[in-house]
Every structure is written in C-alpha cells, then in structure tokens.
C-alpha cells in the first residue's frame, strides 16, 4: 500500500486514476494545482513515505499552477510519478524540450516499445497504451533514461537514483489494457 498525494492538473481523468489507485488499497489524497505549494508541502510532511503523482491535464506544464514549483522543491526528496502533463513537466524540469507533436491525439491506442527494465520488466512488448496528447518531449537530458517510445517519440522516462518517472500515456485509461498492473509496478519501483 502506498501513501499517495495526487496533484490534480484539472483533468477529466484524475478520478479514474484515483479509483484505480484506491481499488489497489492505496491511500490517496487529491489536491488541485491551484492550491498554494506550501499547503501541499505541509500535507506531504505529515505523510509516511509519500509518493507524489502528477496527473494529466490540459495545456503546457509551465501553466499548470503550482506543479513546476513543487517539482523543483521535491526533486530527489521523494518518489514522483508524472502522467502525460506530469511527464512533460518532469522532462522540462530536467532541461528537456516540450513541443507540438505534429498530431492531436484523443483516445488513440498505440503499441509502445520499452526496455523491459524497472517498471516495464515482464510487461508485454510492445505494450498497448492509451495516448491523449498534442505535446511531446524531446532533447531528453542524460539524467533521464528513455525507457519507452513509439515511432521515435518518447513515451516514458525514469531517473532511478531520484526515483522520478514519467509516462506520456495514460495507465488509467481502458485502452491501456494492463494499466492497473503497470501502475502497481511503478509504485513498487518507487520503493526499491
């Protein structure tokens, strides 16, 4: 069981993610990105071994409320998992680029290829996932391992030392057929 603070980037998928996590017996506290950073930091300080999950959301990570400041404050201090917009914010924080992907996807099932390591160990390869995005990460800095891709587009990154990872795809979507199992593996990875 994990103690999770989920930062809601005002996305319609947020509570699908909350339900998926709670159905696997994780304790989940939800705060919107419009809440002041200090309030969220105070809550995290009272949690035992917290994990921060950055939800999907609209727009660019620079305009996602307190998320960029939280990332800078918490990097290396606790495990952080970013999904879609959260993933983009992680890559940007490390110095990568976030830009238009050339297409707008809203509910596209894709087969991604992965490195079969860490959270992907033992997962089918290619792995069917759901993609909902128009932005994509590139120019990934050396501190991040690109551990999944689709047609040369980055679909997942991780930093094993700082226990930070991000996914462009949505594990909480029904189109990610093994999404619940994958999310469980990610949470286990944060504890290794």
UniProtKB/Swiss-Prot annotation:
<feature type="binding site">
    <location>
        <begin position="57"/>
        <end position="59"/>
    </location>
    <ligand>
        <name>L-glutamine</name>
    </ligand>
</feature>
<feature type="active site" description="Nucleophile; for GATase activity">
    <location>
        <position position="84"/>
    </location>
</feature>
<dbReference type="GO" id="GO:0004048">
    <property type="term" value="F:anthranilate phosphoribosyltransferase activity"/>
</dbReference>
<dbReference type="InterPro" id="IPR006221">
    <property type="entry name" value="TrpG/PapA_dom"/>
</dbReference>
<comment type="function">
    <text>Part of a heterotetrameric complex that catalyzes the two-step biosynthesis of anthranilate, an intermediate in the biosynthesis of L-tryptophan. In the first step, the glutamine-binding beta subunit (TrpG) of anthranilate synthase (AS) provides the glutamine amidotransferase activity which generates ammonia as a substrate that, along with chorismate, is used in the second step, catalyzed by the large alpha subunit of AS (TrpE) to produce anthranilate. In the absence of TrpG, TrpE can synthesize anthranilate directly from chorismate and high concentrations of ammonia.</text>
</comment>
<keyword id="KW-0028">Amino-acid biosynthesis</keyword>
<comment type="pathway">
    <text>Amino-acid biosynthesis; L-tryptophan biosynthesis; L-tryptophan from chorismate: step 1/5.</text>
</comment>
<keyword id="KW-0315">Glutamine amidotransferase</keyword>
<keyword id="KW-0057">Aromatic amino acid biosynthesis</keyword>
<keyword id="KW-0822">Tryptophan biosynthesis</keyword>
<comment type="subunit">
    <text>Heterotetramer consisting of two non-identical subunits: a beta subunit (TrpG) and a large alpha subunit (TrpE).</text>
</comment>
<dbReference type="GO" id="GO:0005829">
    <property type="term" value="C:cytosol"/>
</dbReference>
<feature type="domain" description="Glutamine amidotransferase type-1">
    <location>
        <begin position="3"/>
        <end position="192"/>
    </location>
</feature>
<feature type="binding site">
    <location>
        <position position="88"/>
    </location>
    <ligand>
        <name>L-glutamine</name>
    </ligand>
</feature>
<dbReference type="GO" id="GO:0002047">
    <property type="term" value="P:phenazine biosynthetic process"/>
</dbReference>
<dbReference type="GO" id="GO:0004049">
    <property type="term" value="F:anthranilate synthase activity"/>
</dbReference>
<dbReference type="InterPro" id="IPR029062">
    <property type="entry name" value="Class_I_gatase-like"/>
</dbReference>
<keyword id="KW-0456">Lyase</keyword>
<protein>
    <recommendedName>
        <fullName>Anthranilate synthase component 2</fullName>
        <ecNumber>4.1.3.27</ecNumber>
    </recommendedName>
</protein>
<dbReference type="InterPro" id="IPR050472">
    <property type="entry name" value="Anth_synth/Amidotransfase"/>
</dbReference>
<feature type="active site" description="For GATase activity">
    <location>
        <position position="172"/>
    </location>
</feature>
<dbReference type="InterPro" id="IPR017926">
    <property type="entry name" value="GATASE"/>
</dbReference>
<dbReference type="Pfam" id="PF00117">
    <property type="entry name" value="GATase"/>
</dbReference>
<dbReference type="GO" id="GO:0000162">
    <property type="term" value="P:L-tryptophan biosynthetic process"/>
</dbReference>
<feature type="active site" description="For GATase activity">
    <location>
        <position position="170"/>
    </location>
</feature>
<feature type="binding site">
    <location>
        <begin position="134"/>
        <end position="135"/>
    </location>
    <ligand>
        <name>L-glutamine</name>
    </ligand>
</feature>
């Amino acid at each position: 069981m994990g103690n999770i603070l989920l930062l809601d980037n005002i996305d319609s998928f947020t509570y699908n993610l909350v339900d998926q996590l709670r159905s696997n017996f994780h304790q989940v506290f939800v705060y919107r990105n419009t809440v002041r950073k200090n309030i969220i930091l105070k809550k995290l300080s009272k949690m035992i071994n917290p994990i921060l999950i950055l939800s999907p959301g609209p727009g660019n990570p620079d305009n996602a409320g307190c998320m960029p400041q939280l990332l800078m404050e918490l990097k290396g201090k606790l495990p952080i998992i970013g999904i879609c917009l959260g993933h983009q914010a992680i890559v940007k924080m490390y110095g990568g680029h976030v830009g238009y992907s050339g297409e707008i996807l809203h509910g596209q099932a894709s087969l991604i290829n992965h490195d079969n390591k860490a959270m992907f160990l033992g997962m089918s390869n290619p792995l069917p996932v759901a993609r909902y995005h128009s932005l994509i990460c590139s120019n990934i800095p050396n501190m991040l391992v690109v551990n999944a891709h689709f047609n040369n587009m980055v679909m997942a990154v991780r930093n094993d030392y700082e226990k930070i990872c991000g996914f462009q795809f949505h594990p909480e979507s029904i189109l990610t057929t093994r999404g619940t199992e994958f999310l469980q593996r990610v949470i286990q990875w944060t504890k290794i």
